[in-house]
Amino acid sequence: TITCPKAHGELDIYDALTVSCNCAFAQLAEELGQKKLAEYAEKTGLTRPVDVDGYQTAAGSFDADQQQLGQVAWSAIGQGNDLVNPCAMLNFMGGIANHGKAVTPKLIKKITTPAGIPVYFDIMPSKQTLLNKKTADTLSEMMRNNVVNNYGQSNFGQLPICAKSGTAEVGEGAAPHAWFVGFLQDPLHPLAFVVMVENGGGGSAVAGKIANKVLQEAYNAN
């Protein structure tokens, strides 16, 4: 049985994402089916390993048994046997922010001016398209809506942030993993981010605060 912490009533897709309505996305999952969900998990890179300057990350997985009642719905909301590498999620966030184009990850310790001031650098997008532009831009709008109508813009100061929280249950009585992912809608600060706190608890309450602290430093550095 798929449940939510509270009854949300009738929702459109924007509001369903904003309040993280498990039931809404479970319903969509049942309509789409396991095959289509697995296909797009692969297409968007969420289950593929990511190559970061020659270092290959672990692959993720979307393992939903069509024959097992409720398993497709659970997998569609990131539970069940789902696994996603934070680097793959970061790649996906960059793709959304970049109108559907994946951005090649790079390992960089720091880049500064002679005075020690951090500077930004140009990032060359890879040729891989994760999403079409319309879909990516719609997701950007939805993630911006999350901040304005749920997380609260006041919690992020002047950051033009688009984000989604996640609270991943891990079972065996352990506290859930806290996730907070997204990007800044600012061409002068083209920053995507992923914060995952193992057994940290609620997503926005825990990981969101960490993301905000780091982003404030980066955003106000120049």
Regions found by a protein language model. Give the residues of each.
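Intrinsically disordered, low-complexity acidic/polar segments
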Residues: 190, 202-204, 221
